[in-house]
Amino acid sequence: MSRMPTDAEIDEMSEEELEVYLGAGPTQELDRRTRRDAGEDLAARPAWLRRSGAERGFGWLLTVCALIGILACWELISAQLDLLRNPDAELVCDVSPLVSCGDSLNVWQGNLLGVPNSFVGAIAFGALAAIGMVLLSGARLPRWMWWGLSAGSLGGIAFVIWFLSVSIMTFGKLCPFCMVIWSVTIPVAAHSWAWAAAGGHLGLRDNLALDVLKVRWWIMAAMYLAVVLTIVIAFGGQ
């Protein structure tokens, strides 16, 4: 059984440690509840005590990637509006015969839900930025939100795979702002799955969830490598 902290030790506690202590009661191990290392926290806690939060670094990753994604979507929306006003307009994303977005904007592949994909993406990235800022505030997410984040990330990766295949087989071109969106979707997905698993929200065994958290950077690198190799193989001869 853990000992009660002294008054002096309580006075020296940080605000976060004090909140944990007051919420845990005297029978819980204070040092265990305030560990910042996710791997140690995962191994030490029983499932019902696991936090549904994450390190602040994950909050920063979500926020920064979301803001970059919003900017890329905004550029695509602006390009589509320019094209609607003037079909012969020179778009900023039409860099070369290989790197261009004009052909993909006003076709059905660029408007899957009846509105521009970039508009849907901007909404999704806006929600992602909000989640990132919530995590930066130190709050913990409920399980349903982790499920939504994991499912949304899976949908994002599915869209990357689909639109990459369309770019290769249908357009024969690469949209630069789309590639920016792909580049931020990949780390969001890899880290979201890892932290959701670490929080016990994906139903994985403890040791497997810890392994997923440890290799999240490798998962991200593998997805980047798959995209790069696909592009090189498809367009390497052009």
Regions found by a protein language model. Name each.
Residues 115-138, 155, 159:
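Hydrophobic alpha-helical transmembrane segments
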Residues 105-127, 174-186:
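Membrane-interface loop-to-helix entry segments
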Residues 24-56, 199-215:
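Membrane-interfacial, low-structure loops and terminal tails that flank and connect transmembrane helices
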Residues 81-116:
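Extracytosolic (periplasmic/ER-lumenal) interhelical loops and adjacent juxtamembrane/interface segments
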Residues 123-129, 181-198, 223-227:
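Hydrophobic cores of alpha-helical transmembrane segments in multi-pass inner/ER membrane proteins
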Residues 54-84:
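N-terminal signal-anchor transmembrane alpha helix
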